[in-house]
Amino acid sequence: MTLKIGIVGAGGRMGRNLITAVHNAEGVELGAAFERKGSSLVGADAGEVAGIGATGVKISDDLSQNTNFDVLIDFTRPEGTLEHIKFCVANGKKMVIGTTGFDDAGKQAIQAAAEQISIVFASNYSVGVNLVFKLLEKAAKVMGDYCDIEVIEAHHRHKVDAPSGTALSMGEHIAKTLGRDLKTHGVFAREGITGERKRDEIGFATIRAGDVVGEHSVWFADEGERVEIAHKALSRMTFANGAVRAAKWLNTKQNGLFDMTDVLDLNNL
């Protein structure tokens, strides 16, 4: 049976890539596409907006107008995603959430929703990035207590949150491995006379420029040597393909909160 996918933010950069990824994938089809109220794209064919030709799926501005989907993929903004979660819970729809920038209350709302529906919630849907998470845990075990750790990330000028959700996830993987709390050990800005760096800090640096899709590098810097673990995304299709893969994996789950570690079975490496 073909899995039907709904996409919110269908006219955005990520939305168009998601439509293309669904079109190219086996065992799935586009069932619904949505944009914000007032968008000039409402009523347009989603496939034509994405540049793949007509699909017969018209973009709507209201989830209740088209419930022809099993899984909703959401890469929008926290306030919108939280409303979409309410709809999916009420209508028994599964979700793949790639939105970043949630506060603690937003994350708690996602956890609560996962008691009723199945959700994959990840900061990054790239297979490579999720493999990097595991490599960072390995490096932290070996070097973390004896070196300085810095997370450096770069994204396009339109990204609205900083540090990126992926950078924060990298820091969280490292902090958890070292038994540290990122809220107290993370340093997110340095300016002026800061004093010497503390050994147990996990530093973050952010770059916003041009059309950078996404670059992340983590330094484990000791006296006389430095290990760098890096990932560069060259196309948003990397994230879109991963999200569709997550949606297909999620189809067999009735409820629960999962991430790409579960989808890729990385804990069994």
Swiss-Prot record:
Molecular function (GO) terms listed?
Answer: 4-hydroxy-tetrahydrodipicolinate reductase; NAD binding; NADP binding; oxidoreductase activity, acting on CH or CH2 groups, NAD or NADP as acceptor
> Where does this one sit in the cell?
Cytoplasm
One GO biological-process annotation of the entry reads: lysine biosynthetic process via diaminopimelate
> Which pathway does it take part in?
Amino-acid biosynthesis; L-lysine biosynthesis via DAP pathway; (S)-tetrahydrodipicolinate from L-aspartate: step 4/4
Which InterPro entries has this protein been placed in? DapB_C (IPR022663), DapB_N (IPR000846), DapB_N_CS (IPR022664), DHDPR_bac (IPR023940), NAD(P)-bd_dom_sf (IPR036291)
State the similarity comment.
Belongs to the DapB family.
**Name this protein carries in UniProt:** 4-hydroxy-tetrahydrodipicolinate reductase
Please report the organism this UniProt entry assigns to the protein.
Actinobacillus pleuropneumoniae serotype 3 (strain JL03)
